[in-house]
Amino acid sequence: MFQTKLRNESWEDLQKMSCTTEIQVAFILSSFMTFISGLIILLIFRLIWRTVKKWQIIKGTGIILELFTSGSIRRNHVRSLHFHGRFRDRIEMLLSAQTFVGQVLVILVFVLSIGSLIIYFINSADPVGSCSSYEDKTIPVDLVFNAFFSFYFGLRFMAADDKIKFWLEMNSIVDIFTIPPTFISYYLKSNWLGLRFLRALRLLELPRILQILRAIKTSNSVKFSKLLSIVLSTWFTAAGFIHLVENSGDPWLKGRNSQNISYFDSVYLVMATTSTVGFGDVVAKTSLGRTFIIFFTLGSLILFANYIPEMVELFANKRKYTSSYEALKGKKFIVVCGNITVDSVTAFLRNFLRRKSGEINTEIVFLGESPPSLELETIFKCYLAYTTFISGSAMKWEDLRRVAVESAEACLIIANPLCSDSHAEDISNIMRVLSIKNYDSTTRIIIQILQSHNKVYLPKIPSWDWDAGDNIICFAELKLGFIAQGCLVPGLCTFLTSLFVEQNRKVTPKQTWQKHFLNSMKNNILTQRLSDDFAGMSFPEVARLCFLKMHLLLIAIEYKSLFTDGFCGLILNPPAQIRIHKNTLGFFIAETPKEVKRALFYCSVCHDDVFIPELITNCGCKSRSRQHVTVPAVKIVKKCMKGLSSHMAGQDSPPRVHASPSRISDFTTRTFPHDVEQDSDQLDSSGMFHWCKPISLDKVTLKRSRKLKHKFRNHIVACVFGDAQSALIGLRNFVMPLRASNYTRKELKDIVFIGSLDYLQREWRFLRNFPQIYILPGCALYSGDLHAANIEQCSMCVVLSPPSKPSSSQTLVDAEAILATLTIGSLQIDSSSDSSPSVSEETASCTNGHNEKSNCRKVPILIELKNPSNIHFIEQLGGLEGSLQETNLHLSTAFSTGTVFSGSFLDSLLATSFYNYHVLELLQMLVTGGVSSQLEQHLDKDKVYGVADSCTTLLSGRNRCKMGLLSLHQTILSDVNPRNTFGQLFCGSLDLFGILCVGLYRIIDEEELNPENKRFVITRPANEFKLLPSDLVFCAIPFSTACYKRNEEFSSQKSYEIIKEASQTTETHSDTNFPPTIYSVDETSYSPVYSYPSRTNSVYSANQTARNQIRTNSSITSQKPLGDNAKKNGKKISDEISDEDPFAYSEPL
């Protein structure tokens, strides 16, 4: 028994005998000598090869060269090269795993490497200083593995193009330092651990092997496998080095400071070092070990800081954002997809959640195609009660099922207005609509579109349903429509924008005008169903009653005809012939929804004697349930007005205005010029816009003349930036409101585009059917091109922002527009030298508080900014001291005066359209010149590119209300008396002329700070708001109403001078199809009026009655007639214009 035990111990000692220093040096030197000698040999061969190549180039031909170029040797050499090339190609196919054999080879190498590493782990249980005998069974297995590695190393060496680069690769170094010691162990009949721990670096091939095996397919799994392989290979390799040096000790101390440490303890030490947490139970004692720990700690800080948090984030995001949304019964939610970024989400949430917390009962599910960034994730956490983020794509039905889009109230698709390729952005969003509609055809879609011509694809989707709430928000159409309205009526762009912008930021105004402007910014467009007690009353009667009793400004209604095929739509300021029906929807300008509730609660019985708006609440009166037709509407109105008159006797409220018969006759006579011209104008088949035959680009392209600049006057100059490769911004959307049919042909202003001819040529195919459009090749950055367009006499100069460019800075996106504004703003114009001021001059030269006029004025300008934060550049150019010190565009002085516009607020329309799509319809009606969703479908068909085919179509399209900017003294508003307050003016203009006053355009009162007499916008002033003589009034004017007054002192000599100037202008532009605007005698004898169109419809039988009355009263009018000469001259000019128009009754395209 004792002998057996002794024999076993002697056998173990034979297997684990001590390794001498010479044996360890032999193992290490075999690796280093192989590496160094191989590298030296490769360098020598490369040096010799380069020397031979260089010598061949210098010598040209020689004995050796001729020897190599002889016939037989050359053929053998070419054959050898061919064989070598094919052999290398085969090896490369194997090593790249492109074939099945190659995949098996790569996988086998990885598996054998892991097997060799496992053998190292087994052998590491023995002391490092011991050598295993060749009787150890793991040594032959490891020898076989390394023999295969040698074969694989040779294949890789032959396939490498750069041998030296291959020799220095990490996998090559691993093979060089692990394969030679194996063969040395076979020779010495003993094995030593040595540097075999380097085999752990083969773990870096793990992601590639898993991809070959199709084990991982997603990007997250590939990223995770890569991070895991890096961490494990680093840990195992570093632990092997610590295990070697700590068990061997420092060589110069001959191992006296060594310690017995296992490989597991080394791994533990490395992990503790990587996490920068050391407990001190396992430490390095050797100098080599401590030096290695110092450098490894620095590397581990980078590794731990970069890779470990990313791994944690991968696990967290996978669990957090790949789940499904649980749609609970009775819980409302919407799905938002598309451009999910920090800016878009912030803008959407700010507008969608701007209601009170108790009123928000809709959850928002964001469907993003990529995991949210840390900043976006923070936003979602701030709105955790309302938002949920799901990672997925609207293109995949699986992801749509995960967000339960079929149960959602609506699906909102966000676009990126600052993208470099707007067409691609639109197409991707349209594809999302197709995917959602194919998945569930009943899902309501609200989509943002950047370019207007891409809208046509959406109504063609079979399941698209306007009646179900599907809606399109077109940025180009609305943005350019706003700018066009600012050209027609100065300040109107700011007026309309302020109604759709809600400011939550508190600002303390320093001046009186700032206080008025900021208070007016509180107003919004709100809708409310009208009380049934208004049924049977006319719109002016209801608007007056709401204004006086409820302090509400009613501007429009949703009219539904009682006939089956009658009109149904929105009407701005309907005429008195339109009667209010039950359940009519009204549009108000008010501050809060609570205020407009009064229009629903109003009761003619309970609230007849109530004159405090806050007391008009829901009365619950039984009479409200009865049908209102039992009481005539006239009696109700008389009763209400009687109560109002008795109440206003002791208060400052505006009294009812009465007009004398002479004034009414004067007003009726003024409507005549419009009706005479209706039938002579050429319109499109819808009757909404002025139309003409297609005009070639050459006929409207203006040439630079050295003698005289083009005789434009009171025209619109549009500065456009772009080239042949720029994306189209859709100038048709800018032109259409300026060519609305509720202007006569003489009232149309010439439009001159200044820009690159290559760009405008691409836009011209959408503009060629509109009259009086001209193109001046050039650039708005050069004053010479501006003077060529006679910018001194223009009514408005518009600077449109250039199309977005790839990888452009958000700050520099408006650089060209800002520089153009600087150039235009530097132009000083002497207004005293003009014989007859233009429209813009009339506004800019209005008298101030001291009845003085400025002799020098600047060109009226309206600039578009894509980036609202660039407003501080425009503020510096404003020339107005003491301005609002704000970086917010909508709180800036430039915005308050109507000189700047940005479409950034259009993002809020997405939430507005979801809550109340009627508001979006009203906005489209106001800014587009009357384009509706139904009309858009027809405009894209060739058959409507012609003239109106009937008088009915023409009248139904033209008789739309339009907005204007009227003076208190030079227009028919001077007939309103008294007009000391806004309430008095509102009631008087509505009673006398049917004109609806909605706001003011007032001169900034501080003269020393406002040398240019700039005006600011006041939206919906209070009823008691005091008026100033210099105020201009924003009004909704009926189409048939002429707002100018006759100039009694107009001389015939002045008429002759203007006619002469007009004829010269016509001769100057004889080479174009449509000459610039020519002012006839009748036009110049009236004060100009700003006006703009908006889509309304009314009962047109009243207009025919009015025209009959005009013809009857024209013979007995008391107005002083113009001289016979003036009448003849005016008729002559009208005839000339008709003769020169070559596009009368054009054919369809």
From Swiss-Prot:
The annotated regions of Polar residues compositional bias extend over 1106-1120
Q: What keywords were assigned to this record? A: Cell membrane, Cell projection, Cilium, Flagellum, Ion channel, Ion transport, Membrane, Potassium, Potassium channel, Potassium transport, Transmembrane, Transmembrane helix, Transport, Voltage-gated channel
Q: What is its main location?
A: membrane
Reactions that this protein is recorded to catalyse: K(+)(in) = K(+)(out)
Those parts of the protein on the Cytoplasmic side are 46-101, 160-163, 210-226, 313-1149
Short name of any one Pfam family annotated for the protein: BK_channel_a
UniProt function note:
Testis-specific potassium channel activated by both intracellular pH and membrane voltage that mediates export of K(+). Represents the primary spermatozoan K(+) current. The channel underlies a pH-triggered membrane hyperpolarization during the process of sperm capacitation, as sperm encounter the alkaline environment near the ovum in the female reproductive tract, thereby playing an essential for male fertility.
Q: What protein is this chain from?
A: Potassium channel subfamily U member 1
